[in-house]
């Protein structure tokens, strides 16, 4: 997918997440989009040895920070908490599936997206508590973060890493020879 398609997917996720809710808690679809971008880029930029270069992590971090900036601007709140949390989500998702987990399991994707959603919520709430004068109820925040994380598990089960560039080129050239 091209960068324009990813940006459109992120904007659609940001527009849909306040509209879709479970038990009156909004979804956190922006984390899922950044997560998907991170693991796809980690696999696309991997070298022949199996390890990706740093550009996958940098691209995922920049994309995540851009999504966070758009989210901060759209919500009208302080600019920064979502930039930090989505940037970290992009970096971690790219790093985790490149250097920590070498074999892909779909259940692993659900667990990692659940943990990243929790970390995203904690970073956003922590940043807002630290840098602004708002008071937030602890139980309500924990409920929101846990429900959003649980709702993102099915998305994490469905997202799969992309193929490596060399594998994609080989598959494309094989298909061209036979057609």
Which residue ranges define each predicted feature?
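Terminal, non-globular segments
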Residues: 1-179
């Amino acid at each position: 997918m091209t960068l324009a398609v990813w940006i459109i997917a992120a904007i659609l996720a940001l527009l849909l997440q306040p509209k879709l809710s479970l038990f009156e808690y909004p979804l956190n679809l922006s984390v899922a989009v950044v997560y998907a971008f991170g693991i796809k880029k980690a696999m696309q930029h991997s070298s022949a040895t199996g390890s990706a270069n740093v550009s996958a992590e940098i691209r995922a971090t920049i994309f995540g920070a851009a999504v966070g900036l758009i989210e901060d601007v759209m919500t009208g709140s302080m600019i920064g908490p979502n930039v930090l949390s989505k940037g970290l989500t992009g970096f971690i998702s790219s790093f985790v599936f490149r250097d920590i987990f070498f074999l892909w399991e779909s259940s692993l994707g659900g667990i990692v997206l659940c943990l990243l959603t929790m970390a995203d919520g904690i970073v956003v709430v922590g940043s807002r508590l630290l840098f602004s004068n708002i008071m937030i109820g602890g139980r309500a925040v924990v409920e929101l973060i846990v429900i959003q994380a649980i709702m993102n598990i099915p998305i994490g089960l469905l997202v799969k890493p992309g193929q490596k560039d060399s594998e994609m080129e080989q598959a494309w050239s094989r298909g061209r020879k036979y057609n």
